[in-house]
A protein has these predicted regions:
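Substrate/ligand-engaging "lid" and interaction regions
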Residues: 1-42, 46-432
Length: 433
């Protein structure tokens, strides 16, 4: 079986492989998207394909949307050429349950993948056409926190950013300059409203996106490359909003065991590829089942019915409280503790650590005894239920190929936020028992 528009016409074969198919016609969806795009997403990698695209799939399956998502890649163009194009932008999603079973579904809600490359005139024009469409409601992002950075570790502007600031919208290479260039195209087409929604796993992500885009725009204005009114447009949150969000879903690199299962089931061309930018990516995505997305509800041009797809829509304070709950008490401190001790004790699997009674006692103490008494309750997600799921389902899942070595990366930069807030607020009197 092939993963493509023609391939999924083999409904009998897909049914035999126990793979759910989209309940809509991909070609018609792609046509509707080309006519009236609603949603463009920057960052065409696994978290987008395995989580965000699935949200739109739910809406399409339920008849709550007609168009799909346009994926734009600013960093690794090989992803488009080697993964999107051969498979009609479809993804074989494999959800890994704690009991060892899997749930498989073809995610077909991505209408097209575009290389956000100003040197490729045709691709650049396609992206510009999307951004100048009055129908466009949102641009979302999963480009990692590094994707927003304009400066190096010394605080100096990166050479590519300096070049972008000097050359203007037509020669934009850094991701933030590309975004600013697309907003300039939208401004020129009538200064239409849009929401710019960072969905990256970092605190105050919307503010990080806004600050970086505004710095590029301000430099262009200063250098006489764009009018000052464009800066006013981007700075007006009634027209260009930058909502905050909180995202949570473990989406590790493609696992060899999953590749083998899919090949044994009759699928062709499931092998991962390593791109020229060292991205490890496959036609399939494997990830855990639990997932959370909390988004500040500020969309000046309307939005898809995300609340009908399991997304929590709320105000900024609630987003921040949910992020604080996850990062400072209910998930990240537990993860970091396991990562550090896992490396020291020679473990190569988080799930294997959760079979060690002493390590389980450690994470339960950090979570339940130290964290929960001082947790920030966001009101939309129960901290107790969240941490129960982490300890009982997510961390012990042996089918999530996550390692303490990966999580331990940059621990020195994470200790303050992951443990410091609890240390500052906890009263240890309740620990004496």
């Amino acid at each position: 079986m092939k993963l493509s528009y023609q391939g999924i016409q083999d409904k009998q074969g897909y049914a035999a492989a126990q793979v759910a198919l989209p309940q809509y016609d991909w070609a018609k969806m792609a046509e509707k998207t080309a006519e009236k795009p609603v949603w463009v997403h920057f960052g065409a990698g696994n978290i987008f394909r395995g989580f965000i695209a699935g949200l739109q799939q739910r809406l399409l399956n339920a008849g709550l949307a007609e168009s799909g998502i346009v994926a734009a890649e600013t960093f690794d163009y090989d992803i488009i050429d080697k993964i999107y194009v051969p498979h009609d932008s479809m993804t074989l999603m494999v959800s890994l349950k704690a009991d060892g079973s899997t749930q498989k579904e073809v995610i077909a809600s991505i209408a097209k993948g575009i290389k956000a490359n100003c040197a490729d005139e045709a691709q650049w024009q396609q992206l510009t056409d999307v951004f100048t469409a009055p129908s466009l409601q949102m641009a979302s992002f999963t480009i990692t926190e590094k994707g927003y950075a304009l400066r190096n570790m010394k605080g100096e502007l990166m050479p590519v950013v300096v070049s972008d600031m000097e050359n203007g919208p037509k020669q934009a290479h850094h991701a933030m300059a590309v975004v600013a260039a697309m907003l300039y195209a939208r401004y020129q087409a009538g200064a239409m409203p849009i929401a710019m929604v960072s969905m990256d796993n970092c605190s105050h992500n919307g503010e990080k996106l806004r600050a970086s885009v505004m710095e590029i725009v301000a430099a262009w204005v200063k250098n006489g490359l764009v009018p000052a009114d464009f800066e006013a447009y981007v700075n007006d949150e009634a027209r260009v909003s930058f909502p905050w969000s909180m995202i949570d879903k473990i989406t590790p690199r493609p696992a060899e065991i999953i590749e083998k299962q899919l090949m044994d089931a009759g699928f062709e061309d499931m092998q991962p590829v390593i791109t020229s930018r060292n991205t490890y990516i496959a036609p399939f995505v494997n990830a855990e089942v639990p997932q959370y997305l909390v988004v500040e509800d500020r969309f000046p041009n309307g939005r898809p019915a995300l609340d009908k797809a399991g997304v929590y829509l709320c105000d900024r304070k609630t987003v921040n409280d949910t992020e604080r709950m996850k990062v400072t008490t209910c998930l990240n401190p537990l993860h970091t503790a396991l990562a550090v001790y896992g490396c020291l004790l020679g473990y190569t699997s988080i799930a294997a650590e959760m079979k060690d009674a002493e390590l389980v006692k450690l994470v339960k103490t950090i979570g339940y005894k130290e964290g929960l008494p001082v947790v920030t309750d966001p009101g939309i997600i129960s901290p107790k239920a969240f941490i129960d799921e982490v300890v009982e389902q997510r961390l012990p899942n042996p089918f999530i190929p996550d390692t303490p070595q990966r999580i331990a990366t940059d621990t020195s930069q994470k200790v303050g936020i992951r443990f410091g807030e609890t240390i500052k607020t906890v009263s240890y009197t309740h620990l004496r028992a």
